[in-house]
């Protein structure tokens, strides 16, 4: 109702009969003359069709082209971009999770009706997620958390149960609640390895910056708030309050942004990539980027010292491989800039797999697995038994691998997925 009507165009062609028998312009010829004159064309020479507005029609609120044109008329100043295959920067109205970009959110105060965009884009995205799950469900309502391959670090590529929105996002909790127990007297156990790739990163950093690693190993250390503090995004008082349990929306959001920045920067993301992935301005992304590399300078040294081997494939093309001293495997290296990401992600996957192997030896069944997280279904009353199993298994991983940083796991119980992750 608030979007402006949009023009519907038609092509007007030069008429076949421009003139009457007496040499004057025909009715069609006169229309062509007037049309050419309005566009600055010479009617005697212009042969191509001319696009004109035939009528004005109601807008399509799902058309991103129309939405962007409307926002531009409202003096929209985009601050979040994507890049198309040609390398062009495309301004984003909404982020991957369906929420509005900050530049559009900032316009809501002046144009309150824009709030409808937030609801519309999120709901459309969430309906798509649920529809895909319904299509994949069997006759009894079960879906399979399927795998359709591996990454170069041997991590599963997932399908079916993918793009499940975070509980922090609109309707995320409701969608996660769709994954539930089979019987009333059962509970789900969700367990993931605590800050897995951050801990494996610390394992490698120990030989370069042990004092920083010791700081990270303190009981109340929060790597994401530490990064935010070093960037000046939060105060020491705010960090202390958060650690004491006062999780204000402002600090929670800052921590969320710096958590994403922590992981993205570890694997070579630049300012533009950070801006796009986190849905923040380039200025905010730049602060995160500078703060990260000030604290984590050793990551570049670790990458430079990695063991690299070049091998010719069957086409006699050079393939580069990186040796992982923890798994004792060589991993395909896509590009030289991916040295640390390949090393650290490969280590994380290996540690997780060793943990899973230990669990399966004692309890040969998993309900689901996503990245560094597993889900078990068990009877009520057996929670402590399951907790002991998971903790003992991660302890066995520590004894076996002897990393410079001990691994651990977080454990939660609940009736559905929204309660456990």
What are these regions (language model features)?
Residues 278-288:
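Short, basic interhelical loop/turn and adjoining N-cap
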Residues 2-247, 305-373, 388-396:
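Acidic, glycine-rich two-metal-ion catalytic cores of nucleic acid-processing enzymes
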Residues 62, 252-257:
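Alpha-helix N-cap/N′ positions at the starts of helices
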Residues 1-20, 290-307, 381-421:
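Polymerase palm active-site segment centered on the conserved acidic dipeptide of motif C
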Residues 201, 270-280, 374-391:
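Catalytic palm subdomain of template-directed nucleic-acid polymerases
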Residues 256-267:
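Short, amphipathic alpha-helical "recognition" segments used to contact nucleic acids or chromatin
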Residues 269, 273-274, 353, 409:
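Helix-rich, typically C-terminal accessory recognition domains appended to large enzymatic cores
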């Amino acid at each position: 109702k608030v979007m402006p009507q949009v023009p519907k165009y038609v092509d007007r062609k030069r008429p076949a009969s421009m003139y009457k028998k007496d040499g004057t312009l025909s009715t069609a010829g006169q229309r062509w003359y007037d049309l050419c004159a309005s566009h600055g064309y010479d009617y005697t020479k212009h042969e191509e069709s001319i696009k004109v507005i035939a009528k004005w029609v109601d807008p399509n609120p799902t058309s991103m082209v129309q939405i962007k044109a409307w926002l531009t008329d409202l003096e929209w100043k985009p601050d979040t971009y994507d890049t198309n295959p040609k390398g062009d920067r495309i301004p984003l109205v909404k982020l991957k999770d369906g929420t509005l970009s900050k530049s559009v959110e900032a316009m809501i105060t002046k144009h309150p009706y824009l709030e409808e965009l937030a609801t519309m884009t999120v709901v459309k995205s969430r309906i798509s997620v649920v529809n895909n799950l319904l299509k994949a469900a069997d006759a009894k309502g079960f879906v399979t958390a399927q795998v359709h391959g591996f990454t170069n670090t041997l991590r599963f590529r997932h399908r079916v149960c993918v793009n499940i929105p975070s509980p922090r996002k609109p309707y995320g909790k409701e969608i996660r609640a769709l994954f539930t127990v089979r019987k009333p007297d059962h509970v789900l156990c969700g367990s993931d390895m605590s800050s897995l790739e951050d801990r494996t990163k610390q394992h490698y950093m120990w030989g370069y910056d042990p004092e920083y690693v010791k700081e990270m190993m303190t009981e109340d250390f929060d790597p994401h708030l530490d990064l935010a503090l070093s960037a000046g995004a939060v105060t020491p008082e705010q960090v202390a309050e958060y650690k004491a349990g006062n999780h204000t929306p402002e600090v929670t959001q800052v921590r969320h942004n710096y958590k994403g920045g922590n992981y993205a920067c570890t694997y070579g993301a630049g300012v533009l990539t950070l801006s796009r992935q986190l849905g923040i301005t380039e200025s905010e992304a730049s602060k995160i980027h500078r703060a990260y590399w000030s604290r984590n300078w050793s990551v570049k040294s670790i990458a430079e010292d990695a063991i690299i081997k070049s091998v010719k494939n069957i086409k006699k093309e050079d393939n580069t491989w990186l040796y992982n001293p923890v798994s004792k495997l060589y991993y395909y290296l896509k590009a030289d800039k991916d040295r640390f990401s390949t090393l650290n992600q490969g280590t994380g996957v290996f540690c997780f797999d060793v943990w899973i192997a230990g669990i399966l030896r004692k309890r040969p069944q998993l309900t689901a697995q996503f990245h560094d997280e597993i889900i078990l279904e068990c009877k009520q009353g057996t929670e402590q038994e399951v907790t002991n199993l998971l903790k003992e298994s991660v302890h066995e991983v520590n004894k076996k691998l002897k990393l410079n940083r001990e691994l651990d796991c977080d454990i939660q119980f609940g009736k559905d997925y929204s309660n456990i992750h």
